[in-house]
A protein has these predicted regions:
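An extended acidic
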Residues: 1-66, 133, 138-167, 232-258
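Short alpha-helical segments and helix-capping/turn motifs at coil-helix boundaries
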Residues: 13-17, 45-46, 85-88, 186-193
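Solvent-exposed loop and beta-edge segments used for protein-protein assembly and interaction
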Residues: 22, 53-55, 66, 79-83, ...
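Predominantly extracellular/luminal cell-surface or secreted proteins
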Residues: 33-35, 104-108, 205-209
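Polysaccharide-binding surfaces and accessory modules of carbohydrate-active proteins
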Residues: 49, 62-64, 68-173, 186-188, ...
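Short Pro-Gly-centered flexible turn/kink motifs
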Residues: 50, 99-101, 192-211
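Short acidic, Pro/Gly- and aromatic-enriched capping/linker segments at domain boundaries
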Residues: 174-194
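Generic recognition of stable, solvent-exposed alpha-helical segments in well-folded globular domains
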Residues: 183-185, 189, 199, 255-259
Length: 260
């Protein structure tokens, strides 16, 4: 689940409620770097509104930053057939001039609910970042109109006086550190060249599995089927599930019905 800043706070696998591989106290940050300034979603410059999509088990977040002149819309869902968390990300340049907007995703895992023994590394063959510990594997990837993610790094956090790899994004460039062991984290960057008031959409996902091979197979599945198709099919599935019975709500208000 995500919090009020659209940060993923809980990832349960292999069961709902067991095990939590973020623990609720670490962060999967989202931020934007524009014109030499980085604002994570926790920054006071952001105005963030989150909701559920109507008749769908999917989250929708609109984040607006007047200081940066950027708007970001996130549509979040878990694919209904496989263990894949999907994010459809639409970025709008609200400025009157063309700019490069960089979107960063930071990942702090506590795999097996233990702050030791984890590994994070960049897989150059599949162009993905993988976090793993034993039979718990988290493959992170994404795709935009010009290919995969543009930048990456791995590191360690909350140990040896290091805050975490999210600090590496502050200058708008990542160190491309290939691998780390221990309490490891990572950052992915997507770089968008946007004309004045232009919007572009890209996709980001986390495939969760019990082996690296299985995670790579899930990643190949997303690329083959296209992430946009998976987002739409998941929305359609839940819409059909919610509406398979014709309920009589006996005059309840629309807001009350939507809670149901």
């Amino acid at each position: 689940c995500t919090d009020k800043y659209a940060e993923v706070r809980d990832i349960y696998f292999p069961y709902v409620g067991l095990e939590n591989h973020i623990g609720g106290h670490f962060s999967h940050r989202v931020g934007a770097y524009v014109d030499g300034q980085l604002n994570w979603f926790t920054h006071s410059n952001w105005r963030i509104d989150s909701n559920f999509q109507d008749s769908a088990l999917a989250g929708e977040t609109l984040a607006q930053n007047g200081a940066l002149g950027v708007k970001i819309k996130l549509n979040d869902s878990v694919y209904n057939e496989k263990n894949i968390f999907l994010r459809e990300v639409t970025v709008t340049n609200d400025s009157d001039r063309a700019r490069t907007v960089k979107i960063f995703f930071n990942h702090e895992f506590e795999i097996y609910e233990s702050h030791r023994g984890d590994t994070a590394y960049f897989d150059p063959i599949h162009h993905a970042v993988i976090h793993y510990n034993g039979k718990r594997v988290f493959l992170i990837n994404g795709v935009s109109d010009h290919g995969g993610f543009d930048d990456y790094t791995t590191g360690i956090f909350k140990i040896e006086g290091k805050e975490g790899s999210f600090k590496d994004a502050e200058d708008g460039l990542l160190a491309k550190n290939l691998i780390e062991h221990g309490p490891s984290d990572s950052v992915l960057g997507f770089y968008l060249n946007l004309a004045p008031h232009e919007s572009k959409t890209f996709y980001y996902w986390i495939a969760v599995a019990e082996s690296i091979k299985e995670a790579r197979d899930l990643n190949a599945y997303v690329l083959e089927r296209r992430p946009g198709h998976l987002v739409r099919s998941t929305r359609d599935y839940w819409h059909a599930w919610v509406n398979k019975y014709d309920f009589n709500f006996y005059g309840l208000k629309k807001e009350e019905i939507s809670l149901f």
